Swiss-Prot record:
Protein name per Swiss-Prot or TrEMBL: Alcohol dehydrogenase
Gene name of the encoded protein: Adh
Sections of the chain in a coiled coil: none
Active site: Y151 (proton acceptor)
EC numbers, comma separated: 1.1.1.1
Enzyme class per UniProt: oxidoreductase
UniProt keyword list: NAD, Oxidoreductase
GO biological process, alphabetically ordered: alcohol metabolic process
Cellular component terms per the entry's GO annotation: cytoplasm
Lineage summary: Eukaryota, Metazoa, Ecdysozoa, Arthropoda, Hexapoda
Matches recorded under InterPro entries: ADH_Drosophila-type (IPR002425), NAD(P)-bd_dom_sf (IPR036291), Sc_DH/Rdtase_CS (IPR020904), SDR_fam (IPR002347)
Binding residue positions for NAD(+): 10-33
Subunit note: Homodimer.
Keyword check for Metal-binding: no
Gene3D superfamilies in the cross-refs: NAD(P)-binding Rossmann-like Domain
């Protein structure tokens, strides 16, 4: 899709990968960038506004773990103001296997609920125009970091959800693809808890291997947005953007 003159909602658009991606999106000239984030960061919002004064950047506080009804209410406020939204980016995520319920709530349920909520406004069966969902998942959805099985499983679940809704596009009019970053230099990976403390040095060990910067990831994210391939499974690793071919071992046949 062409980002210029589009309306974009970015959940967690002020995080590590999120903020650099917001910067790259703003440079591409959307009409509106609506940032939904749990933590308010006025300085970051001001920076985004200054980066391209032609873009209207708006912030709303949002915790993806709220009930579905609250998410729908917030989206109604946004749609009432913008009338149309072209792209929803779901980017909320935590990495802490000591917080099992919250990891699942943020990394998986939050993605499902926000996507489900926007269907009220996009689903062509309800007279909607359709739209595009970009879900930030992880390479751990391909192969887990086994020391953080809860995080890895939550990202695998988000990836599975995304590939499923992509296949429903002919019914709903809503397309989807997944963004799967490799190990990226963010606060998230500098220190985190393994499951049951099976490996206290997991973050340190992980960072001994090659990583990528948030800017590299963000620039490739924008390329994936522009490619706009329904059902694509994008790997953003070591500064590269690659489409993954998923190996099929079983098919429901329906």
């Amino acid at each position: 899709m062409v980002i210029a003159n589009s309306n974009v909602i970015f959940v967690a658009g002020l995080g590590g990968i999120g903020l650099d991606t917001s910067r790259e999106i703003v440079k591409s000239g959307p009409k509106n960038l609506v940032v939904l984030d749990r933590v308010d960061n006025p300085a970051a919002i001001a920076e985004l506004k200054a980066l391209n004064p032609k873009v209207t950047v708006t912030f709303y506080p949002y915790d993806v773990t709220v009930p579905l009804a609250e998410t729908k209410k917030l989206l109604k406020t946004i749609f009432d103001k913008l009338k149309t939204v072209d792209l929803l980016i779901n980017g909320a995520g935590i990495l802490d296997d000591n917080q099992i319920e919250r990891t699942i709530a943020v990394n998986f349920t939050g993605t499902v609920n926000t996507t489900t909520a926007i269907m009220d406004f996009w689903d062509k069966r309800k007279g909607g125009p359709g739209g595009v969902v970009a879900n930030i998942c992880s390479v751990t959805g391909f192969n887990s970091i086994y020391q953080v099985p809860v995080y890895s499983a939550s990202k695998a679940a988000a990836l599975s959800f995304t590939t499923s809704i992509a296949k429903l596009a002919h019914i709903t009019g809503v397309t989807a693809y997944s963004i799967n970053p490799g190990i990226t230099k963010t606060v998230l990976v500098h220190k985190f808890n393994s499951w049951l403390s099976v490996e206290p040095r997991v973050a340190e060990l992980l960072l001994e291997h090659p990583t990528q910067t948030t800017l590299q990831c963000a620039q490739n994210f924008v390329k994936a947005i522009e490619a706009n391939q329904n059902g694509a499974i994008w790997k953003l690793d070591l500064g590269r953007l690659d489409a993954i071919e998923w190996t099929k071992h079983w098919d429901s046949g329906i």
